[in-house]
Amino acid sequence: MHQLVLLRHGESVWNKENLFTGWTDVELSPSGEEESRKAGLLLKEHGFVFDMAFTSLLKRAIKTLWIVLEQMDLMWIPERKEWRLNERHYGALQGLNKAQTAEQYGDEQVKLWRRSYKVRPPALAEGDRRHPSFDPRYHSLQGELLPSTECLQDTVERVLPFWRQQAVPALRQGKRILIAAHGNSLRGLIKYLDQVSDEDIVGLEIPTGSPLVYELDSDLKPMRHYYLETGKTG
């Protein structure tokens, strides 16, 4: 059996303020830090140990991982930061209040941008300073890889090369893996692992700071998955 744990980062300050976040690099809120500590303690209490960890290039996920590993006394294990695990890019919506955006564009349009599998929000202009091309952490990436906006389908397609090239080889080596990432990048992994339909994946809710445990067979197919605190199937 292979062990994989997925963890959405703790609440961020923009989660708390109901703002579109995407690739904006915001901090964890105090509640998010506490969620991360509780997740680490929960994993430790249940006897989980990891051989390596993956996270995104965004500090709300990075700090979640660090807090969890500190609680587990596992800060020494290898960790890799992968841009493909970043949150979905919300384009020109990033930084806007979700309720105010709905008032401006209408509930149905905003619902399409947020929850449709294939509809992208308005894109950032290339000259917009929020565009990832201005961020030094992405300077090594070719321009065509950097999104100015994404739908969920784009995010899924971005995440899958990480799964195949990074996670699968590590799991096949017998490594126990923790992935601390974001709601939509984790949706991409869950969609692939559980063969969730395009229609159903958009409605899948992933709570912040709650470890989702996968037990995988020799072919890396899920035998069982559950949220740790309740044992409830995901």
Swiss-Prot record:
Homodimer. It is an enzyme of class 5 (isomerase). Substrate binds at residues 8-15, 21-22, 60, 87-90, 98, 114-115, 183-184. The active site is at residues 9, 87. It comes from the Bacteria. The keyword rRNA processing does not apply. The record marks 182 as: Transition state stabilizer. Pathway: Carbohydrate degradation; glycolysis; pyruvate from D-glyceraldehyde 3-phosphate: step 3/5. Signal peptide: none annotated. Its EC number is 5.4.2.11. GO terms for biological process: gluconeogenesis; glycolytic process. NCBIfam families: pgm_1 (TIGR01258), PRK14115.1 (NF010713). One of its GO terms (molecular function) is phosphoglycerate mutase activity. Keywords: Gluconeogenesis, Glycolysis, Isomerase. HAMAP family: PGAM_GpmA. This is 2,3-bisphosphoglycerate-dependent phosphoglycerate mutase. Coiled coil: none annotated. Catalyzes the interconversion of 2-phosphoglycerate and 3-phosphoglycerate. It comes from Geobacter sp. (strain M21). Belongs to the phosphoglycerate mutase family. BPG-dependent PGAM subfamily. It catalyses: (2R)-2-phosphoglycerate = (2R)-3-phosphoglycerate. InterPro entries: His_Pase_superF_clade-1, His_PPase_superfam, PG/BPGM_mutase_AS, Phosphogly_mut1.
